[in-house]
């Protein structure tokens, strides 16, 4: 009996020891079982297979910004190309503005933090008690002037096709809509407006403003997860033609190439714009502060339409204001000469005139060195208080001096840091098109790593916040209950910045500087 008891005890101890060792096994196991099986679409090397495909969505959009009541109305025709080998009977369209609809579920599931200083409306919004209705008002969904059947489910809309789309088919349909633009300073948001009470004007940063096609791929079919505010998006690539109607004294910054500068700009502005295309040593001021201040006082009543085109991009965004100062500079990137440009109200000066376009230029140069040559015609930094947000060729960035124009080193370096980071997003995810709604680190972590390289290579003694081992120590020493693996859905990540930005960036810094060495790492990266 004693021997049996001793044997059982020994077995139990071995079992417990084995159980204690279990959490460590996955850290060192080979990745074969965790990686998808190679197929004709995606090879074992990670390269596209011989039958790789991706869908395409082309847009013809016309929108009008109402500066009197802060609304945006628009129409679009989407031409969807089914390049898949599968027949489609319905399409999914993203309606991101519906996160601000009055029946939105977003406030019920979003994580929020209440600090000592926060607008009352932002608290109300986080509690689902906001009376603002910022959702899309869909007026029609048609094809060949005939209505289509559609179902709206919060931030997603399913369109049922009258006739299935066979492989190789394309289908065009039109949507008309409008929505109330949100006050970013009161209720937050990735886009919206900021009101300046001293002069009675607005700066509009407009994004996710049109119904956008969802991704359909061989990996998971339709990517139709709801937009809850944190996890951003993945989108099919396509060609855009966009007309933006605004008050005639507004200056527009936008994704793409401006097609009608002679109609949108004054003669003097057009001349300066042309000069900027060959100015490699310093920015050219296209709209001066004096000109912008004059327009603040004398608001135009007529309108003008700015026309743009953008090829092979996944999204489109713009900014508009009569308050904008505008400068631009040419950058030599391989065989390309993109324009680095900045748009900012007088409240951003003198910091923005000194630093923004210079930071855009340095970012394009360094990211192109580590990845691929920047392929787009422009890269734009727009001044927008309290946010940092990116879209193809354009981003919205914080960093405002004091009212007297003074600013601290902290304000300066944080402003430069956010410009580098958001301009860098043109590479991750705008070109590689990773799915941040699913895996945030593949966007933010990769971008933060190259942001760190840009800061240390282009600026002397730059106080980088993320990317070095010493800056990640407090997080890694913290309560393990609040540390998540980087392969965590974006809506479930705790300590979002440390987990999705800093941890992957630091790991790659260690891999580059200590494990592999810069030469091998840079060749592989």
Where are each of the predicted segments found?
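A surface-exposed beta-strand-loop module
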Residues: 71, 81, 87-88, 118-196, ...
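Bacterial Sec-dependent N-terminal signal peptides
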Residues: 1-23
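Short, hydrophobic/aromatic-enriched beta-strand segments in well-ordered soluble domains
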Residues: 76-78, 82, 95-97, 169-183, ...
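N-terminal, polar/Ser/Thr-rich
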Residues: 19-73, 207
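Hydrophobic alpha-helical and helix-loop surface patches within well-folded domains
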Residues: 24-42, 57, 308, 341-525
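Hydrophobic helix-coil surface modules that form long, contiguous segments used
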Residues: 211-222, 228-420, 449
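Glycine/proline-rich low-complexity spacer/linker segments in large multi-domain proteins
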Residues: 103-118, 179-240, 260-261, 329-331
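Ligand-binding face of N-terminal immunoglobulin V-set domains in extracellular IgSF glycoproteins
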Residues: 72-99, 104, 115-119
């Amino acid at each position: 009996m004693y021997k049996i008891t001793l044997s059982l005890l020994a077995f139990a101890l071995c079992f417990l020891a084995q159980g204690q060792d279990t959490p460590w096994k996955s850290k060192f196991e080979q990745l074969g079982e965790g990686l998808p099986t190679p197929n004709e679409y995606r090879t074992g090397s990670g390269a596209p297979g011989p039958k790789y495909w991706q869908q395409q969505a082309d847009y013809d959009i016309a929108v009008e910004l109402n500066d009197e009541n802060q609304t945006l109305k628009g129409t679009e025709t989407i031409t969807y190309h089914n390049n898949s080998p599968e027949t489609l009977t319905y399409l999914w369209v993203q309606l991101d503005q519906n996160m601000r609809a009055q029946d939105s579920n977003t406030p019920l599931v979003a994580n929020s933090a209440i600090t000592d200083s926060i607008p009352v409306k932002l608290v109300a919004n986080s509690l689902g008690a906001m009376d603002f209705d910022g959702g899309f008002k869909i007026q029609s969904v048609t094809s060949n002037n005939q209505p289509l059947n559609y179902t709206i489910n919060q931030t997603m809309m399913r369109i049922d096709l009258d006739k299935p789309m066979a492989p190789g088919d394309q289908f065009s349909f039109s949507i008309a809509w409008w929505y109330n633009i949100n006050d970013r300073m009161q209720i937050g948001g990735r886009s919206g407006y900021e009101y300046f009470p001293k002069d009675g004007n607005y700066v509009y940063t407009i994004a996710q403003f049109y119904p956008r096609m969802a991704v359909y791929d061989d990996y998971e079919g339709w990517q139709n997860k709801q937009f809850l505010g944190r996890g951003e998006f993945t989108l099919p690539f396509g060609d855009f033609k966009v007309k933006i109607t605004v008050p005639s004294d507004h200056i527009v910054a936008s994704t793409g190439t401006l097609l009608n500068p002679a109609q949108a700009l004054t003669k003097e502005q057009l001349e300066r714009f042309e000069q900027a295309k060959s100015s490699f040593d310093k920015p050219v001021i296209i709209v001066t502060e004096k000109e912008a201040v004059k327009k603040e006082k004398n608001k135009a009543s007529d309108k003008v339409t700015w026309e743009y085109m953008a090829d092979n991009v996944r999204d489109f965004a713009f900014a508009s204001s009569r308050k904008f100062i505008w400068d631009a500079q040419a950058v030599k990137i391989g065989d390309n000469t993109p324009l680095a440009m900045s748009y900012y109200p007088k409240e951003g000066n003198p910091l923005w005139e000194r630093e923004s376009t210079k930071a855009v230029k340095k970012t394009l140069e360094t990211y192109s060195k580590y990845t691929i040559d920047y392929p787009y015609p422009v890269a734009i930094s727009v001044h927008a208080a309290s946010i940092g947000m990116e879209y193809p060729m354009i981003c919205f960035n914080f960093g405002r001096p004091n009212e007297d124009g003074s600013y601290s080193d902290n304000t300066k370096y944080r402003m430069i840091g956010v410009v580098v980071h958001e301009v860098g997003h043109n590479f991750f995810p705008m070109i590689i098109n990773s799915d941040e709604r699913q895996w945030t680190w593949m966007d933010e972590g990769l971008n933060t790593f190259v942001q760190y390289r840009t800061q240390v290579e282009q600026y002397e003694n730059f106080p980088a916040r993320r990317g070095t081992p010493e800056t990640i120590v407090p997080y890694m020493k913290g309560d393990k209950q609040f540390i998540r693996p980087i392969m965590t859905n974006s809506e479930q990540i705790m300590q979002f910045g440390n987990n999705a930005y800093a941890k992957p960036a630091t790991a790659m810094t260690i891999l580059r500087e200590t494990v592999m060495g810069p030469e091998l790492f840079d060749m592989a990266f």
